[in-house]
């Protein structure tokens, strides 16, 4: 949502549909979902007069966000949500590695009182050594892993109990077999699964995630994006959603297929997703 009230309204709608776990973002990651700096300023101003820094005259096109203004707005968002909705609903927030490690540590400490289900991706993979300091200063549960590509990234975090949820992208780490090994290793160390399931994952990937969920005693939660009619038309066997739970069918294998003839009706469109063109107020390119 664009402000606390809009986020609250959207959560209430999800609660009426039966959802018990909701990821809460004000704007997109880092609070930005547009390259219109005036609109960003207006959105943040709604969050109790938080103003982003000004940009230079000849700013480069991109999705602008102010990490400092964002970090100030997040605790105020969850203060509003807990006051209005209480503690019977579980909240998640995704930092998307868009702040400095020190800011992430401070954010995790500040959010403790709001009892998040977890804080997602507080630091980038190249900054995972900072998680030790974060863990020493905050009890906010941490989820990480969607950008990991090899065992040397996730193993030390699990060995040293620096994360609570592992959320790798299954195909990126090698597929179902490596992911199952990771799930078992995580189970031995008290870490639960939360496989990456963004809106751009295929229904085949969604089914792979869910079969891993069903076979893992340490299942934590599954990120899930609702599927439109076109996807259900092209991929017969898509999971069904009912009151916040996702259901697989009992067909062989992953239980899903692809109709290539129907897929041909939906040609790919080129272009760069605008949200990946992230920039800080002075125009510096940032990770998406």
Spans of features found by a protein language model:
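Metal-dependent enolase-superfamily TIM-barrel catalytic cores that perform enediolate-based chemistry
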Residues: 1-132
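Short, electropositive, low-hydrophobicity segments enriched in small/polar residues
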Residues: 31, 149, 248, 257-259
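Shared catalytic-loop signature of beta/alpha-barrel
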Residues: 109, 115-118, 124-252
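Extended hydrophobic packing segments that form well-structured cores
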Residues: 254-288
């Amino acid at each position: 949502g664009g402000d606390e009230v809009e986020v609250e309204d959207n959560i209430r709608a999800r609660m009426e549909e039966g959802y018990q776990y909701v990821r809460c973002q004000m704007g997109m990651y880092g609070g930005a979902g547009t390259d219109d700096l005036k609109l960003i300023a207006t959105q943040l101003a709604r969050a109790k007069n938080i103003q982003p820094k000004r940009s230079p005259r000849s700013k480069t096109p991109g999705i602008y966000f102010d990490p400092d203004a964002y970090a100030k707005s997040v605790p105020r968002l969850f203060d509003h949500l807990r006051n209005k909705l209480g503690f019977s609903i579980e909240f998640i927030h995704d930092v998307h590695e868009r702040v400095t490690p020190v800011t992430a540590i401070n954010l995790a400490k500040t959010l403790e009182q709001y009892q998040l289900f977890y804080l997602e991706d507080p630091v980038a993979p190249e900054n995972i050594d900072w998680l030790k300091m974060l863990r020493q200063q905050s009890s906010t549960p941490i989820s990480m892993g969607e950008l990991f590509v090899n065992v040397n990234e996730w193993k030390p975090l699990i060995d040293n109990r620096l994360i609570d949820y592992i959320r790798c992208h299954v195909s990126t780490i090698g597929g179902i077999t490596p992911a199952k090994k990771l799930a078992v290793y995580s189970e031995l160390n008290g870490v639960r699964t939360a496989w990456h399931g963004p809106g751009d994952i295929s229904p085949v990937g969604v089914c792979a995630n869910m079969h891993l969920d069903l076979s893992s005693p340490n299942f934590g939660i599954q990120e899930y994006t609702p599927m439109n009619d076109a996807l259900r038309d092209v991929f017969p066997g898509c999971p069904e959603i009912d009151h916040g739970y996702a259901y697989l069918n009992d067909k062989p294998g992953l239980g899903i297929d692809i109709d290539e003839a129907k897929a041909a009706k939906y040609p790919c469109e080129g272009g760069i997703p605008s949200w990946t063109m992230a920039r800080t107020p002075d125009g510096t390119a940032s990770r998406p």
